[in-house]
Regions:
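Substrate-binding/catalytic groove segments of enzymes
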Residues: 212-214
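M16 family metallopeptidases and their MPP-like homologs
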Residues: 217-219
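N-terminal secretory signal peptides that target proteins for export/translocation
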Residues: 1-4
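Short amphipathic alpha-helical segments that mediate assembly, nucleic-acid/protein binding
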Residues: 6-7, 24
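Structured extracytoplasmic
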Residues: 21-162, 170-175, 180-199, 204-209, ...
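Bacterial N-terminal signal peptides
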Residues: 8-18
Length: 307
């Protein structure tokens, strides 16, 4: 009803003002809780193009998240193009190797669990300050909280960071997280290793479908002589693009067929996808137009003909 619009607008404005008035740490707690719940309930599977660069190796590949594990079609390795025959051979080898699949599955579970644990300490490990709002996000700055006592090595490294985080204003999701190691971190009193101050990390996330957010870029540049994360090197740039949602029941064989149907060049594939989408939209318009009665069939009543 028209009379309810001012009241509805007032409620929206009050809710927005309430969000802005929240203490920075409470904003972070809300975002963390939202992320944990979303992760638990997210059962989407994706196909995407990935470019991953590390000092010792680099790879460009199409990746399909099948039912339990992911299958990769490596297009380029260390700057060298991988032949299509080799691509097929590598995918088939993985499909027929239960041990490799189990190893990937366990590694993924470990990474997810570790990420969740680090996410949980985010509100308390740092002192938070709101620095502004921009583009639908709330900007926050963080620095180590001297009262926080990290429970393990990973948390100790994480809590030695200072940086910035952006939270999506409407969905309370973490959009970006950037940090810099502000002090050296010794592991085992320096005997097991040391990470040097000045190292950085930068993570960007994007909403791919309603309420589904995924990491699209990860940049880690930390100098030292110890690895903290099993699947992330100290120097790595990982960028994902060309996301396409696929069925959660996709088998590895189906994933292989889907991957082989793609153009090795992600830009050309994006152009092909856009063209296909336009053709489907055009076909839909044509179909609707053929089902609508023509004006000549409506008689001579001009008002009826205009409906």
């Amino acid at each position: 009803m028209p009379g309810t619009r001012p009241f509805t607008l007032l409620v929206v404005l009050v809710a927005a003002a309430s969000l802005s008035a929240q203490a920075p740490r409470e904003l972070v707690k809300q975002a963390v809780q939202t992320e944990l719940v979303a992760s638990e309930n997210d059962h989407t599977h994706w196909l995407y193009f990935e470019s991953d660069s590390q000092p010792s190796k680099s790879v460009k590949q199409w990746v399909a998240e099948a039912r339990l594990v992911s299958l990769s079609r490596v297009i380029e390795r260390n700057g060298q193009t991988v032949s299509e025959a080799q691509q097929k051979q590598e995918m088939s080898a993985f499909i027929n190797d239960p041990h490799a699949q189990s190893k990937q599955h366990k590694s993924g579970q470990h990474d997810d669990e570790q990420a969740a644990e680090l996410l949980k300490i985010l509100p308390d490990a740092f002192l938070w300050t709101k620095t502004g709002e921009s583009g639908g996000t709330i900007q926050l700055h963080f620095k180590p909280d001297p009262e926080f006592h990290p429970p393990d090595i990973e948390a100790r490294v994480f809590s030695a960071m200072e940086g910035d985080m952006a939270i999506d204003r409407d969905q309370h999701r973490i959009a970006t997280l950037k940090g810099r190691l502000i002090r050296d971190v010794k592991i085992g009193y320096g005997i097991l290793g040391e990470l040097q101050a000045g190292g950085t990390f930068d993570v960007e996330r994007r909403e791919l479908s309603p309420n589904v957010w995924e990491i699209v870029e990860t940049h880690v540049h930390i100098q030292g002589h110890a690895l903290i994360f099993k699947t992330i090197s100290e120097n790595e740039d990982d960028v994902k693009s060309n996301f396409r949602q696929i069925a959660g029941t996709t088998s590895l064989q189906q994933a292989q067929s889907e991957l082989l149907s793609l153009n090795p060049d992600p830009q050309k594939q994006e152009t092909a996808d856009r063209s296909a989408a336009e053709q489907r939209a055009s076909a839909g318009r044509d179909e609707r137009s053929t089902t609508q009665p023509r004006a000549s069939h409506l008689g001579k009543n001009p008002k009826l003909a205009q409906r």
